[in-house]
UniProtKB/Swiss-Prot annotation:
Keywords: Amidation, Carbohydrate metabolism, Cleavage on pair of basic residues, Disulfide bond, Gamma-carboxyglutamic acid, Glucose metabolism, Hormone, Hydroxylation, Secreted, Signal, Toxin. Gene3D superfamilies: Insulin-like. Coiled coil: none annotated. It is found in: Secreted. This is Con-Ins G3. This venom insulin, from a fish-hunting cone snail, facilitates prey capture by rapidly inducing hypoglycemic shock. It is one of the smallest known insulin found in nature and lacks the C-terminal segment of the B chain that, in human insulin, mediates engagement of the insulin receptor (INSR) and assembly of the hormone's hexameric storage form. Despite lacking this segment, it both binds and activates human insulin receptor (long isoform (HIR-B)) with a high potency (EC(50)=242 nM). It comes from Conus geographus (Geography cone). The keyword Signal applies. It comes from the Eukaryota. One of its GO terms (biological process) is glucose metabolic process.
Length: 113
């Protein structure tokens, strides 16, 4: 009786874990949901979405982006913050669009060069 009881507890625990994992992933993968992104979260998200595109363009021209060349003189956080701060679209900056107001990942991608 105790062996089957322990087996039942383990099976229920695993089932609960799988259900919780599946439920959580559905909500975190939805990039269409507008979200406020500020500070380092905004900078990290921007770099994650746009950094590869900037590198490819730099390789085609034979040079890297000037901001990324100065990385040795600036801390990584300061470089990300400066890059995100100066991005403009229709007179509105990335902070106004995605921090002051909620924005989607698709909207954030419009700031990629």
């Amino acid at each position: 009786m105790t062996t089957s009881f322990y087996f039942l507890l383990v099976a229920l625990g695993l089932l609960l874990y799988v259900c919780q994992s599946s439920f959580g992933n559905q909500h975190t993968r939805n990039s269409d949901t507008p979200k406020h992104r500020c500070g380092s979260e905004l900078a990290d998200q921007y770099v994650q979405l746009c950094h590869g595109k900037r590198n490819d363009a730099g390789k085609k021209r034979g040079r890297a982006s000037p901001l990324w060349q100065r990385q040795g003189f600036l801390s990584m956080l300061k470089a990300k913050r400066n890059e995100a701060f100066f991005l403009q679209r229709d007179g509105r900056g990335i902070v106004e669009v995605c921090c002051d107001n909620p924005c989607t990942v698709a909207t954030l991608r419009t700031f990629c060069h």
